[in-house]
């Protein structure tokens, strides 16, 4: 009887320890999150996708007004604390905490412009959703490489970097980055190259470039369109 009693006590202790350890392990923030940033008179609907890695960081994207799948920066996950930055016009830093049940992520959003601090709350609604890398038809060698341009908007000059490359499998890929808004590389969603004419779509920011490459292959001259906004944009090949 004593042996049986001792066995039960040991088993109870082990189970108790296991439960304690499990309770101390925070939930994984990986997943698709939906919610809003709360302003005094309105709520701005947003969606965030996170995929945690083993080093306290991870991969993430942001979707909101006129933005879908914009890459997040500075992702940091420490226990229940989760932080990330949206490096875009109107963006800012998110700092939040994961609820014990792993279903809610809430905290504060600090806007880049004005430094306003606003509450946000997100609810988990499934697995993280990331678009597969886009592969377009092969482009001419005159388009391959890195291109630099300057876009004028509301009296501000923004430096734009465009990268286009052919891949070994016969496809092409591209990215666009605003060097004055965090230099985040946004994937190009479509590249069309017919003779000298070039069309580049950037679905993430609902933007597109339509233009032509010169005979020397040193300039791309055209127009950038994003919603109702249009402006001339000329890229020069980087040496």
Residue ranges and their predicted role:
Residues 121-140, 236-239:
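Intrinsically disordered, low-complexity Ser/Thr-rich linker and spacer segments
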Residues 9-19:
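Bacterial N-terminal signal peptides
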Residues 2-3, 18-21, 126-131:
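N-terminal targeting/docking segments
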Residues 6-7, 23-25, 53, 125, ...:
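Positively charged, low-complexity intrinsically disordered regions
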């Amino acid at each position: 009887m004593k042996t049986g009693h001792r066995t039960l006590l040991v088993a109870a202790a082990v189970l108790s320890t296991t439960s304690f350890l499990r309770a101390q392990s925070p939930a994984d923030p990986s997943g698709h999150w939906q919610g809003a940033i709360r302003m005094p008179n309105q709520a701005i609907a947003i969606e965030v996708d996170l995929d945690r890695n083993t080093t306290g960081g991870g991969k993430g994207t942001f979707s909101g007004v006129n933005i879908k799948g914009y890459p997040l920066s500075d992702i940091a996950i420490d226990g229940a604390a989760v932080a990330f930055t949206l490096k875009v016009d109107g963006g800012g830093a998110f700092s939040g905490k994961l609820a014990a049940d792993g279903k809610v992520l809430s905290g504060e959003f600090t806007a880049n412009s004005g430094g306003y601090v606003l509450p946000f709350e997100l609810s988990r609604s499934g697995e993280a959703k990331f678009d597969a890398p886009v592969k377009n038809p092969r482009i001419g060698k005159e388009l391959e490489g890195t291109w630099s341009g300057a876009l004028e908007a509301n009296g501000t000059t923004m430096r734009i970097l465009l990268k286009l490359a052919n891949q070994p499998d016969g496809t092409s890929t591209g990215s666009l980055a605003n060097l004055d808004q965090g230099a985040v590389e946004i994937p190009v969603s479509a590249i069309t190259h017919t003779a000298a004419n070039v069309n580049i779509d950037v679905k993430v920011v609902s933007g597109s470039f339509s233009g032509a490459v010169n005979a020397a292959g040193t300039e791309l001259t055209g127009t950038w369109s994003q919603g109702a906004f249009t402006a001339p944009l000329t890229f020069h090949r980087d040496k």
